[in-house]
Amino acid sequence: MRKKLTALVLSALPLAAVADVSLYGEIKAGVEGRNYQLQLTEAQAANGGASGQVKVTKVTKAKSRIRTKISDFGSFIGFKGSEDLGEGLKAVWQLEQDVSVAGGGATQWGNRESFIGLAGEFGTLRAGRVANQFDDASQAIDPWDSNNDVASQLGIFKRHDDMPVSVRYDSPEFSGFSGSVQFVPAQNSKSAYKPAYWTTVNTGSATTTTFVPAVVGKPGSDVYYAGLNYKNGGFAGNYAFKYARHANVGRDAFELFLLGSGSDQAKGTDPLKNHQVHRLTGGYEEGGLNLALAAQLDLSENGDKTKNSTTEIAATASYRFGNAVPRISYAHGFDFIERGKKGENTSYDQIIAGVDYDFSKRTSAIVSGAWLKRNTGIGNYTQINAASVGLRHKF
């Protein structure tokens, strides 16, 4: 009996040593379908006989078939813990990893938010792959789960969300206010960017058009983030800011806003400069009601001193009825300004509607439908329709 008791105590010692380590994550997957529709309007010259050339308009419409597949909706696993160092100081750490129940996915550990740091009365200081302030604010405005982050999530609006390799400081809360600053060294920032483009080759017997993907090069520049938060009862507010002097990373974000419209084809676009982003988010929670509103301004400068800017708004509302939580989101991007000129009919509109049904505190069914229309000029647009149904389990 004594031997059994001794063995039991010894086996419990390793568990006690790691008692401050938490295992957590989400497994979520389902079936999703999507299709694309587009319209291209071209002005052409036609022979008008005695009257000479007559301009006519050619309208081309196309629609893809509905593509349906089983997808992972962003599953991940994480470990986090802390150690009391005495005198109110403690070490904190976290390691998160993307996983996929649909196979494939990331192969490197720590590809989500992963860091080590110190926390105390002074606040929290972390280094590693740390979420930026835009990612923090998006938790309220975009709670959707999907494999299609452009249409079935507010992917265009959230294009500045990131988890860069950086150092971040978060202050303690003072009368509901708290702040944060974050620094990304140039060697850890995203690489310089040469825009993707289409090239046409004539071999004599045939003409082929090939898509050349974006090319990365040397590191860009230091990137700075800052955030200010306020919370009072059911109300919460957040301001997020980003600045990069040599904004090579900005071109990626601007092209995402354009949804790959090819606007930079043959223009020799330089990497962007003085790239700054401002986002203001406000939310209210009362009982089963959740409301969130956000506005975002994206500013940048080209090598020839001309300016680019985009302005967007987004809103999300949900209400709990027993186990069901119906939800709707809307986002709108106004006509952008590129190289100092307003792009006519270059706005976008997006609607996502769905419902979560909780079988328990940890397991839910998730259903959503999405519609995104991106105007790419007068008479031109790209439209994405998507729907998904799946299951999510939190642990």
From Swiss-Prot:
Nuclease is among the record's keywords: no
Signal peptide coordinates: 1-19
Membrane topology, from the record: Multi-pass membrane protein
Keywords: Cell outer membrane, Ion transport, Membrane, Porin, Signal, Transmembrane, Transmembrane beta strand, Transport
GO molecular function annotations of the record: porin activity
Matching InterPro entries: Gram-neg_bact_OMP, Gram_neg_porin_domain, Porin_dom_sf, Porin_Gram-ve, Porin_Gram-ve_CS, Porin_Neis
Cellular-component GO terms for this entry: cell outer membrane; pore complex
Superkingdom of origin: Bacteria
Location of the protein in the cell: Cell outer membrane
Oligomeric and partner information: Homotrimer.
PANTHER family: MAJOR OUTER MEMBRANE PROTEIN P.IA, PROTEIN YDDL-RELATED
Protein task: Serves as a slightly cation selective porin. Major antigen on the gonococcal cell surface and it may have pathogenic properties in addition to its porin activity.
Family listed: Belongs to the Gram-negative porin family.
Descriptive protein name: Major outer membrane protein P.IA
Species of provenance: Neisseria meningitidis serogroup A / serotype 4A (strain DSM 15465 / Z2491)
Taxonomic path: Bacteria, Pseudomonadati, Pseudomonadota, Betaproteobacteria, Neisseriales
Protein encoded by which gene: porA
